[in-house]
Amino acid sequence: MKKQKMSLKHLKKYQKESVLAPLFKLLEALMDLTVPLVIAQIIKNGIGQNDMGFVLKMFGILLLLAVLGMAFSFTAQWFAAKASTGYATDLRQELFDNIQDLTYAELDQLGTDTLITRMTSDVLQVQTGLNLALRLLLRSPFIVFGAMIVAFTIDVKSALIFVVTIPVLAIVIFTIMWISIPLYTKVQSALDKLLGTLRENLLGVRVIRAFRKEDAEVQQFNQENDTLTQYNEHVGRLSALMNPLTYILINVAIITLIYVGAFRVDGGIIAQADVVALYNLMALIIVELIKLSSLIITINKSLASLERIEAVLVVKREMVYPIEPVKEDASAPAVIFDQVSFSYPQAGADAISNISFVANRGETIGIIGGTGCGKSTVVQLIPRFYDVQSGKVCVNGVDVKDYPQGELVAKVGMIPQKAVLFEGTIRENMQWGKEDATDEEIWHALEIAQAADVVRSKNGLDAMIEQNGRNLSGGQKQRLTIARALLKNPEILIMDDSASALDFATDLKLRRAIHNLGNQMTVFIVSQRASTVRAANQILVLDDGNLVGIGTHDELMENCKVYQEIYYSQFPEEKPKEVMA
């Protein structure tokens, strides 16, 4: 309940709409409750007395009630729509803002697919539930109990049928509601999993076809789709009980009402018009209870969705950034790793263990090792994408945990393994690195990144990039992301295997161009190519999360067996004969 109160705080902005929408629906309900009484008067005093003037007068009143009811309904719908859409917009914005603030570890734990579902499907479900609740949550009970009260004014004994029927119906409805809430949560979770599989297949369709795995993927999708279908069918069967049970109870009540009413009319206690009025009141109750049952089903779905949204909103951010700027040591090395160990959430074993090294300002640091040895993990700790479990990472002599987020981010230019570009012009993508970058600055960065020719071939900086850079090759995307990072002019440039799609000649030109900048930029190059890191001032050799070698290329060729194996596997022609033997 506390979680739901947290989300409902956004309704404070729409207090007026949240009050006026139910109020106008109550006014509409009042019009509906008046109609059976007017009809009874038409039958009793108009038709019964053959008074056409009275009939026409009552017809005018019925018409007025209809017009007023329609006006009240339209106004209520307008206020309800304004409140629900506004609330959903604010909730979606808060959810998006919260996701933007989550750490990499928290994002990994929640998962991309479930976040997308909660941002879209769940928020829409909450919006629908709120809209219906504002319109019907008070209106339907008001008509049900109002009709019962009006029935007592007509005939007390006949009204007792209403007294018995309504509580029984309430028990049926709320029992089904109580059982169905957990099922809707399972439906949304199954939808998360299905969307995850769908997203994975769409992104990896070329790989799937290359390995002829279409049938296996279809089978997996069908299994997850069947699971979702089973949950939906379970919910559907349960929900399907609602209307039949309510109809049975209502029909029994109507038959009883007509039966009792007939005896009381014969006894002269009530008139035929009163029985008609009682029947119309019961019909009103039927309609509203059906609406109420549908509303409860929708509210159940909305509450399940709201709970899933709250699970993201209440995530307590573990990574806290200071506000005060730090005092750096101008004489300190650019980066220091001091006995650093780190493991990913729920991974068990450490990704890296007891890593220690010093990177001086202006140096190029190469990081090499086999797949999964922890290369990317090391460089992701420098901009504090994750917090270390033990040890310390320092930038310019200051622990990265002591830096304000903006200050640390400004110092580090990160080029990830997967080149990410956004839909828009090349200029717009480049200006992610520097918002006010001039065309001259952009072209300079493109020249260094060996991407200038690519841009010229695309008709310049105003050429459009499709979503995820679909209209560019892998190497072109990598060069553009490198140029974007260079525009930032960072103190520390991290290239996390970001030139893997480049040919050897272009890769060499790129490294030489960065080296020839002549500034004090410290460069980290993560690669599986020995040729890429060979000229680095220091090379870190990782094996299964451990630092097994550190030094220059020549030093490592002398004393690091892992580095020798990597190098000779790529340059077998340089392997000495005695080693080959």
What are these regions (language model features)?
Residues D329-A581:
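ABC-type nucleotide-binding domain
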Residues K12, S18-T75, F79, F152-K157, ...:
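Transmembrane helix-loop-helix hairpins at lipid-water interfaces of multipass membrane proteins
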Residues L23, L27, M31-V35, F72, ...:
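Hydrophobic alpha-helical transmembrane segments of ABC transporter permease domains
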Residues H10-K16, D101-A105, S121-L130, L134, ...:
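An intracellular "coupling" helix at the cytosolic face of ABC transporter transmembrane type-1 domains
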Residues L95, I99, I208, I309, ...:
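Helix-loop junctions and hydrophobic alpha-helical segments within the transmembrane domains
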Residues L23-F24, M31-K44, L65-T112, I116, ...:
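Juxtamembrane helix-loop junctions of ABC transporter transmembrane domains
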